[in-house]
From Swiss-Prot:
Function: Probable core component of the endosomal sorting required for transport complex III (ESCRT-III) which is involved in multivesicular bodies (MVBs) formation and sorting of endosomal cargo proteins into MVBs. MVBs contain intraluminal vesicles (ILVs) that are generated by invagination and scission from the limiting membrane of the endosome and mostly are delivered to lysosomes enabling degradation of membrane proteins, such as stimulated growth factor receptors, lysosomal enzymes and lipids. The MVB pathway appears to require the sequential function of ESCRT-O, -I,-II and -III complexes.
Domain characteristics, as noted in the entry: The acidic C-terminus and the basic N-termminus are thought to render the protein in a closed, soluble and inactive conformation through an autoinhibitory intramolecular interaction. The open and active conformation, which enables membrane binding and oligomerization, is achieved by interaction with other cellular binding partners, probably including other ESCRT components.
Cellular compartments per GO CC: amphisome membrane; autophagosome membrane; cytosol; early endosome; ESCRT III complex; kinetochore; kinetochore microtubule; lysosomal membrane
Expressing tissues: Expressed in lung, testis, heart, spleen, skeletal muscle, kidney, liver and brain.
Cross-link (Glycyl lysine isopeptide (Lys-Gly) (interchain with G-Cter in ubiquitin)): 179
Keywords assigned by UniProt, alphabetized: Cell cycle, Cell division, Coiled coil, Cytoplasm, Endosome, Isopeptide bond, Lipoprotein, Membrane, Myristate, Phosphoprotein, Protein transport, Transport, Ubl conjugation
Protein name stated in the entry: Charged multivesicular body protein 3
Alphabetized Pfam families for the sequence: Snf7 (PF03357)
Residues with lipidation of kind N-myristoyl glycine: 2
Region annotated Intramolecular interaction with C-terminus, chain positions: 2-113
Keyword NAD: no
Site (Interaction with STAMBP): 218
Amino acid sequence: MGLFGKTQEKPPKELVNEWSLKIRKEMRVVDRQIRDIQREEEKVKRSVKDAAKKGQKEVCVVLAKEMIRSRKAVSKLYASKAHMNSVLMGMKNQLAVLRVAGSLQKSTEVMKAMQSLVKIPEIQATMRELSKEMMKAGIIEEMLEDTFESMDDQEEMEEAAEMEIDRILFEITAGALGKAPSKVTDALPEPEPAGAMAASEEGEEEEDEEDLEAMQSRLATLRS
């Protein structure tokens, strides 16, 4: 506490160092999320291969869409890391300016990076807090809340899912189809007939559905 009960402001250098530490901490969180999503994606890929061998087209489509969503999530997380690196560079510049001018200066580069970072759900809370502190310190201006969220184009998703399944099917058959299938509607390999398989088919389908739902749930949790 300062005089008359007022909170004493932290020195600019201390503020910059604190912001840099918080950003590096969030970068480690993002790295961990990327690894978790990619690890789960490998499991999904194996499940797609298994479903294709059983001739389960619908399961292939659902899982392929999950892979696409996961890859989009990873791309956004990598983009957020790039923005955080921009902010870190901006903090280094602020320290250099501070040594010469004796005060922090407004930065359009930091402003642009923070505008992008506050829109990312995984790190939104921390970035909003940092933005308020930076606004108070005069580094960035007040940012308007951008409520517009771009929606995934359904047709683009369908086409991407078809392309992903085509690629995976071609990989599974080791080129036995002669070429990569052009559409998901192309015939999938038929399951080999077996007497014992017919009796347990219903139970296996229920297990497959449960596994599919569990996998979707895990991926959704990792992306959120």
